[in-house]
Curated annotation (Swiss-Prot):
CDD domains associated with the record: ASKHA_NBD_BK
PANTHER family: ACETATE KINASE, BUTYRATE KINASE 2-RELATED
GO molecular-function term, one example from the UniProt record: butyrate kinase activity
Keyword Cytoplasm: yes
Origin organism lineage: Bacteria, Bacillati, Bacillota, Bacilli, Bacillales
Species the sequence originates in: Bacillus cereus (strain G9842)
Annotated protein name in UniProt: Probable butyrate kinase
Length: 367
């Protein structure tokens, strides 16, 4: 089998994770920490791309990586327009939306740009894989009870789909032939109904839907939320933080550290025990609801993400849902590996690269 050498790039707010893979085998994985003062000089996140590019090239050189031997570069997908899952070739339309922050400004927008900037000089393809804006929801799943307020698909697409493919392989099937309920449990928690390779429904793990998590509130009593918003006690930004960043375990018990909470549970702390059980309860409840989306025809339930390392949490969830289907646990996440695998499927011609297309009437992002 021929060897495809792939450079993968995953930009974060103050760091850039890079990896070099020979097919599935990691040759190099490194987290480049950026000086906060250095990146603070740039008015916009997008203006950092030249600085980050040079830093990446310097690190590769220091490790003896000859970039002329690369076959492709793959970056983390950013806040683009809603698109179906898959591996996309970075094109002009995508670059424009990433640079303009069409669906928002985030460090992940640099992924496709950095991939293109490095790949174009080497005359090799640049890709992105399964960004958070992946939207494969069925029309019936979009409807909410208020006109003009559509449900949105924002979830851990990269890890959910990567793990779903691993589970399919484990079950000796293609991902596209299975019905899976995949739950990513990290700082946020999302439960996706994967129907024959498409995530036809999923809770919005960012903006207050689904189970509460270490730092997100999830679904809360809407009437009480409205009252709190108009109480005059909070600014808008404070309310947003209550939903994302200061919600969930942070609000309920004062920490987003699930390991710390688990130790409290093990010591018999009644409050920690109830709250941790409640989080598992809400995850199980979301999985149960998602099973109805797939008419109860589920090949497996998958638990992944950092919280899937928690035996207490996993056992609580299993106890409530293992009657639906077998529960398979794939703890942690590996975004670099997932990006490399997405590029590799295209290089091996196992799937065709997708094209990012902008429709003329599409002037604002849906999502």
């Amino acid at each position: 089998m021929s060897v495809n050498r792939i450079l993968v790039i995953n930009p974060g707010s103050t760091s850039t994770k890079i990896g070099v893979f020979d097919n599935e085998r990691p040759v190099l994985e490194e987290t480049i920490r950026h000086d906060v003062e250095q990146i603070g000089k740039y008015k916009r996140i997008i203006d950092q791309y030249e600085f980050r590019k040079e830093t990446i090239l310097e690190v590769l050189h220091s490790h003896g990586i000859n970039i002329s031997k690369l076959n492709a570069v793959c970056g983390r997908g950013g806040l683009l327009r809603p698109i179906e899952g898959g591996t996309y070739t970075v094109n002009d339309a995508m670059l424009e939306d990433l640079k303009n922050g069409f669906s928002g400004h985030h460090a992940s927008n640099l992924g496709g740009i950095l991939a293109y900037e490095i790949a174009s000089g080497l005359n090799i393809p640049a890709f992105i894989v399964d960004p958070v804006v992946v939207d494969e929801m069925e029309p019936v799943a979009r409807i909410s009870g208020i006109a003009g307020m559509e449900r949105k698909s924002i979830f851990h697409a990269l890890n959910q789909k990567a793990v779903a493919r691993k589970v399919a392989e484990q079950l000796n099937h293609k991902y596209e032939d299975l019905n899976l309920l995949v739950t990513h449990m990290g700082g946020g928690i999302t439960v996706g109904a994967h129907k024959k390779g498409r995530v036809v429904d999923v809770n919005n793990g960012l903006n207050g839907e689904g189970p509460f998590s270490p730092e997100r509130a999830g679904t809360v009593p809407v009437g009480q939320l409205v009252e709190m918003c108009f109480s005059g006690e909070y600014y808008r930004d404070e309310m947003i933080k209550k939903l994302v960043g200061q919600g969930g375990l942070v609000s309920l018990i004062g920490t987003n550290d699930a390991i710390k909470v688990e130790k409290m549970v093990e010591k018999g702390d009644p409050e920690a025990t109830l709250i941790y059980k409640a989080m598992a309860y809400q995850v199980a409840k979301e999985i149960g609801g998602a099973s109805a989306v797939l008419h109860g025809k589920i090949d497996a339930i998958v638990l992944t993400g950092g919280l899937a390392y928690s035996k207490i949490l996993v056992d609580e969830i299993k106890e409530r849902v293992d009657w639906i289907a077998d529960v398979i646990v794939h703890p942690g996440e590996d975004e670099l590996e997932a990006l490399a695998e997405g590029a590799l499927r295209v290089l091996r011609e196992e799937e065709a690269p997708k094209e990012y297309v902008v429709r003329e009437k599409e002037t604002v992002a849906r999502g």
